[in-house]
């Protein structure tokens, strides 16, 4: 586990080449075919050398859910077990990790810092404006909430700001139980936040050089996709989509995509700091791979 751009995929591939692991992607965007550059998906050569399960399994028009992931991941884990190998779950969609390991029963607890921030914004702009913003990130919840219902708007927005997942995605998870497996939680993150921020900016600029705009343009030109679909709401894709529709100019698109990616990383780190029984590794360490391999061998892997 780790924030976006922390080096999870490279580490996972290295581990799978050294140990009897098979990788399962835990990423709500990599499931979609055609979302390659903007998700930093492993390339064809990497996928041939080390297979990744739950990558490229559905069309962007399909609203893939946490519930569907739970079922798919369980099936893949069982398949890997039959092969007498160990599943290596890799990604940054914290809700997916959460329902596998801890199950799901209640909504996330309130975060007073986030709540205060939302209240200050509402005092300045009004709850109707906050409702408009909610509609952009969680249209299902926004459709059920009156624009003047401050309490429900605040809670829905708070859940998203804290977890990076819309409230509506939680409301379909009450039936899921934690899987009956022992999880070894490894968290990869840099100690220096500025390192991650710089890496996020450099990575997005490299995506643009690698024809990310053309990738999104192909999706845009299909005609059957829209900005409310989970695939298109993915960080980076959402901003380029607005650029293609004329809502943003190029520099605004770039700035907002980088800022949104940094906010995503912040939300992911909020989840991770609360994660029980986790071993942290520093993304910046040059001997990272050997550190992780030694740790895993030391606990009997």
UniProtKB/Swiss-Prot annotation:
UniProt-listed GO biological process terms: tRNA modification
Domain of life assignment: Bacteria
Descriptive protein name: tRNA dimethylallyltransferase
Catalytic activity of the protein: adenosine(37) in tRNA + dimethylallyl diphosphate = N(6)-dimethylallyladenosine(37) in tRNA + diphosphate
Lineage: Bacteria, Pseudomonadati, Pseudomonadota, Gammaproteobacteria, Legionellales
EC number in record: 2.5.1.75
InterPro entries xrefs: Dimethylallyltransferase (IPR039657), IPT (IPR018022), P-loop_NTPase (IPR027417)
Chain segments carrying region Interaction with substrate tRNA: 27-30, 151-155
NCBIfam families named in the record: miaA (TIGR00174)
Subunit and interaction comment: Monomer.
Source species of the chain: Coxiella burnetii (strain CbuG_Q212)
GO molecular function ontology, one term from the record: tRNA dimethylallyltransferase activity
Free-text function comment from the UniProt entry: Catalyzes the transfer of a dimethylallyl group onto the adenine at position 37 in tRNAs that read codons beginning with uridine, leading to the formation of N6-(dimethylallyl)adenosine (i(6)A).
